[in-house]
Swiss-Prot record:
Residues 166-194 are annotated as: Disordered. Keywords: Cytoplasm, Hydrolase, Protease, Ubl conjugation pathway. Belongs to the DeSI family. GO terms for molecular function: cysteine-type deubiquitinase activity; deubiquitinase activity; K48-linked deubiquitinase activity; K63-linked deubiquitinase activity; long-chain fatty acyl-CoA hydrolase activity; palmitoyl-(protein) hydrolase activity. GO terms for biological process: proteolysis. Pfam families: Peptidase_C97. It is found in: Cytoplasm. GO terms for cellular component: cytoplasm. The keyword Cytoplasm applies. This is Deubiquitinase DESI2. Residues 173-184 have a biased composition (Low complexity). It comes from Rattus norvegicus (Rat).
Length: 194
């Protein structure tokens, strides 16, 4: 039995970038796919794990101050269950790693289109990723932008939390090893020579 859930593309205006590109007729947009009341998106970071993150649907504030919600586009519907979608997103995370992000060749809109094709068999509208199409004409564009503009704040927070968790696990493991060593050392000190 299918769930028949709407698949919605949430589009955000990256107005700080559009100040530069609108004069040549190219809009720059961030996008994410909303399904089951959750929005999945992709962004870059310098680490070899998934760059896919989740925000509250349509909440530009979670992306950062330079993003503004533009519109929601209903793409279709899906019969995948929520658990299936989590597995699909996890699998896509193997391809959409943070350190694989490229503004022109593998960006949030490429991810949104890939997820949309899986969920409802449709690509996102072409105008949303027009920048990638024109990138061969303006290859210098990415080099002109500050790196921090390329990583949404929500993803930075997610990456920071994941790194913090890894650090805490490493510290806990080191503390356990130190305690085990101390305990073992204490036992050997109790032995007396015969």
């Amino acid at each position: 039995m299918g769930a028949n859930q709407l698949v919605v593309l949430n589009v955000y205006d990256m107005y700080w970038m559009n100040e530069y590109t609108s004069s040549i007729g190219i809009g720059v947009f961030h996008s994410g796919i909303e399904v089951y009341g959750r929005e999945f998106a992709y962004g870059g970071h310098p680490y070899p794990f998934s760059g896919i993150f989740e925000i509250s649907p349509g909440n530009a504030a979670e992306l950062g101050e330079t993003f503004k919600f533009k519109e929601a586009v209903v793409l279709g519907s899906t019969d995948f269950l929520e658990d299936d979608i989590e597995k699909i997103v996890e699998e896509l995370g193997k391809e959409y790693k943070g350190n694989a992000y490229h503004l022109m060749h593998k960006n949030c809109n490429h991810f949104s289109s890939a997820l949309s094709e899986i969920l409802c068999g449709k690509e996102i509208p072409r105008w949303i990723n027009r920048l990638a199409y024109f990138s061969s004409c303006i290859p210098f564009l990415q080099s002109c932008l500050p790196k921090e503009w390329l990583t949404p704040a929500a993803l930075q927070s997610s990456v920071s939390q994941e790194l913090q968790d890894e650090l805490e696990e490493a510290e806990d493991a080191a503390a356990s090893t130190a305690m085990a060593s101390a305990a073992a050392g204490g036992r050997t000190g109790r032995h007396t020579k015969l």
